[in-house]
Amino acid sequence: MTTALLVIDIQNDYFPNGKMALTNPEKAAQNAAKLLSHFRNTGAPVFHVQHITEGNIAHFFHPNTEGVEIHESVRPLEKETVIVKHMPNSFFNTDLNGKLQEEGVKELVVCGMMSHMCIDATVRSAVEHGYVCQVVEDACATTTLQIEDKIVPAEHVHYAFMAALNGVYATVKTTEAFLK
């Protein structure tokens, strides 16, 4: 079974001084870089996903800005595929599924940002497209959320979404556990 790494939205706007800084993006990016190194060393396929905002739907990832660029810690090599998306689901209106099929990919190892948006939406869609998924949770990051007067800390958001994916949609692991 061909396994590919899917690195989602590890982009400058999610880091300190970016327009949508997350909680601990550096730690997630560092772990994603370890996964990237592993996949490159084994010659397995690597796919990067880059979100570019269209219109005024979000205040970050605007075209032709430094914030939209893929972070230097996981910058794609020339031979690696970059999928551009405009919605949280990396399969929606993109050629991701076709590119994965061209490579014979059946299983995805997913990492990136944000846990509660693009990671969640993409993993659920991947399963609907017939892929087996693993999510490397400490190579993902998110942010604190609010609903009415309730504040939900980023750590709680992250683990709630990882727990929701674990089992039916994915096997959720740490970087260390995956690399063993």
From Swiss-Prot:
Keyword Hydrolase: yes
Keyword ATP-binding listed: no
Pfam families (UniProt xref): Isochorismatase
Enzyme Commission numbers on file: 3.-.-.-
Keywords: Hydrolase
InterPro entries on file: Isochorismatase-like_dom, Isochorismatase-like_hydrls, Isochorismatase-like_sf
Gene Ontology molecular function: hydrolase activity
Position of the signal peptide: none
Record family assignment: Belongs to the isochorismatase family.
Name recorded for this polypeptide: Uncharacterized isochorismatase family protein YddQ
